[in-house]
């Protein structure tokens, strides 16, 4: 209903912020680990990511893809925003490629979040180390946990990896 209204009103300026790939695939919010690029033409046939977030037991992936393409394309006066160059590049390879895409990185309000004195390096005995910080709500392969584990095996003793978030 929303996109039908937006198409009927080209005089309205529209800005749509994408935070993942769901808008231009038949199902997937993220497809990189499945190494699937069907979304660049048409999601059809077997979906290697069907049991991943967002999980589905239904096989309406091709019809979802076609429905999204029909609904989301052809909206005049719309700009897409992504929080990364990577996502912008993915959008530019999708059926949304005809829209202007701008990158606006996620920001930090420095009036709320500011550097404060801390003894955290002393507490964990890493005062002399260079810290590589990783932050994720939940750590898993998709968020790069395996990469951090591999990195930790190859770093010199001058470095310490600090990960913040939850993991199994």
Each model region followed by its residue ranges:
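Acidic anion/phosphate-binding donor-loop and adjacent secondary structure
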Residues: 89-92, 108-123
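A short beta-strand/loop micro-motif in the catalytic core of glycosyltransferases
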Residues: 15-19, 73-85, 102-104
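A structural signal for the hydrophobic beta-strands that form the central parallel beta-sheet
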Residues: 82, 103, 134-135, 163
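Conserved donor-binding/catalytic core segment of Leloir-type glycosyltransferases
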Residues: 81, 125-143, 149-153
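Glycosyltransferase donor-sugar binding loop
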Residues: 108, 135-138, 160-168
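Membrane-proximal helix-turn-helix segments that form the acceptor-binding/catalytic region
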Residues: 8, 39-80, 93-95, 99-100
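Conserved nucleotide-sugar donor-interacting segment of glycosyltransferase catalytic cores
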Residues: 1-45
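Short aromatic-enriched loop/helix-cap "lid" or pocket-rim segments at secondary-structure transitions
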Residues: 26-31, 36-37, 94, 114-117, ...
């Amino acid at each position: 209903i929303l996109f039908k209204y937006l198409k009927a009103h080209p005089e309205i300026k529209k800005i749509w912020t994408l935070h993942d790939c769901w808008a231009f695939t038949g199902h997937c919010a993220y497809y990189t680990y499945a190494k699937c690029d069907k979304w660049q033409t048409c999601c059809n046939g077997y979906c290697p990511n069907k049991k991943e977030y967002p999980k589905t037991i239904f096989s309406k992936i091709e019809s979802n893809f076609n429905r999204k393409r029909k609904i989301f394309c052809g909206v005049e006066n719309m700009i897409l925003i992504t929080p990364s160059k990577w996502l912008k590049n993915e959008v530019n390879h999708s059926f949304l490629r005809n829209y202007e895409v701008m990158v606006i990185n996620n920001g930090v309000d420095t009036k709320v979040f500011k550097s404060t004195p801390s003894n955290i390096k002393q507490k964990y005995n890493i005062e002399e180390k260079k810290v590589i910080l990783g932050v994720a709500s939940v750590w898993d392969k998709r968020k790069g946990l395996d990469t951090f584990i591999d990195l930790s095996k190859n770093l010199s003793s001058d470095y310490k990896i600090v990960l913040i978030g939850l993991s199994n």
